[in-house]
């Protein structure tokens, strides 16, 4: 006999690109997590949410531990600068770790980041900026997801090459398929050039997008630092507010919804099978 159990769940508002500090070389140890939470709840109608605090090339341990103490759904994240080609501008890429919010874990990650980025705000033409392979090798003992910027003129993956440069499409297609799980932007508008870039690489299907605010000031949330930033369109995730929930959603695009208002409740159906036989 088959039994189907329905579990009703709420869509999860996610923002995985929030800065705690204007200057990543001098982190703000007094970042106002409570203010951020209040602004998020005001925006999302007091719905469940998951966030990541992604400063440039470092992790604000103080802010993460404060957020953990508030019982928030958190993923450890960093906004990395990565070099695609020598003598070309670096691009920005988020890395999210499947790791507990603990002192020693964050210290271990920051130790690696300090080796990779002695200066947390390198010039985008800095030849010492690590490439994707160095990043992967450096964090090979951790479980992580990589999501590069898309659509934004500053730091987007598809702008990390020199004008007129003839790329090996096979190599870049391999980088995307093997290393990236999607990309980030403030909304779905302005993605034409990013999507066109993927098509030139032979990637014709739509690539999973996670929208994020790129906020620096919790009082002004969800505004970005840039006055030219496009309007923010929230992403709602139909999964548990965890790293694994994010990974699942990036593999099943139907689990990511883009809306300024909360989508309807969703349900997971768990099917069980009872075997009724006296010989079993």
Predicted regions and their residues:
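Binuclear metal-dependent hydrolase catalytic cores centered on His/Asp/Glu-rich metal-binding motifs
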Residues: 91, 97-139
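Hydrophobic, aromatic-enriched interface-forming segments
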Residues: 123-166, 181
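Charged catalytic cores and adjacent phosphate/nucleic-acid-binding surfaces used
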Residues: 1-47, 60-77, 81-103, 154-280
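Divalent metal-dependent hydrolysis catalytic cores, especially in the metallo-beta-lactamase
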Residues: 40-57, 145-147
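Extended, solvent-exposed polar beta/coil surface segments
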Residues: 1-16, 52, 128-141
């Amino acid at each position: 006999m088959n039994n189907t159990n329905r579990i009703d769940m709420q869509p999860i508002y996610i923002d995985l690109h929030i800065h705690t500090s204007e200057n990543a070389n001098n982190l703000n140890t007094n970042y106002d997590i409570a203010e951020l939470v209040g602004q998020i709840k005001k925006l999302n109608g007091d719905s469940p949410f998951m966030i990541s605090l992604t400063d440039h090339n470092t992790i604000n341990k103080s802010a993460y531990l404060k957020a953990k103490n508030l019982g928030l759904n958190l993923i450890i994240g960093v906004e990395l600068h990565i070099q695609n080609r020598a003598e070309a501008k670096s691009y920005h890429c988020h890395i999210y770790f499947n790791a507990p919010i603990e002192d020693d874990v964050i210290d271990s990650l920051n130790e690696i980041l300090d080796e990779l980025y002695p200066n947390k705000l390198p010039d985008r033409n800095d030849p010492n900026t690590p490439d994707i392979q160095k990043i992967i090798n450096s964090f090979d003992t951790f479980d992580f997801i990589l999501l590069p910027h898309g659509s934004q003129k500053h730091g987007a993956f598809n702008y990390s090459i020199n004008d007129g440069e003839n790329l090996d499409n096979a190599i870049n297609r391999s980088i995307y398929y093997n290393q990236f799980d999607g990309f980030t932007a403030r909304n779905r508008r302005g993605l034409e050039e990013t999507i066109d870039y993927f098509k030139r690489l032979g990637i014709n299907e739509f690539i999973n997008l996670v929208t994020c605010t790129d906020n620096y000031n919790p009082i002004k949330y969800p505004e970005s630092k840039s006055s030219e930033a496009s309007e923010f369109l929230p992403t709602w995730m139909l999964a548990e507010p965890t790293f694994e929930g994010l990974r699942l959603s990036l593999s099943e695009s139907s689990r990511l919804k883009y809306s300024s208002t909360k989508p309807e409740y969703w349900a997971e159906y768990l099917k069980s099978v009872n075997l009724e036989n006296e010989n079993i």
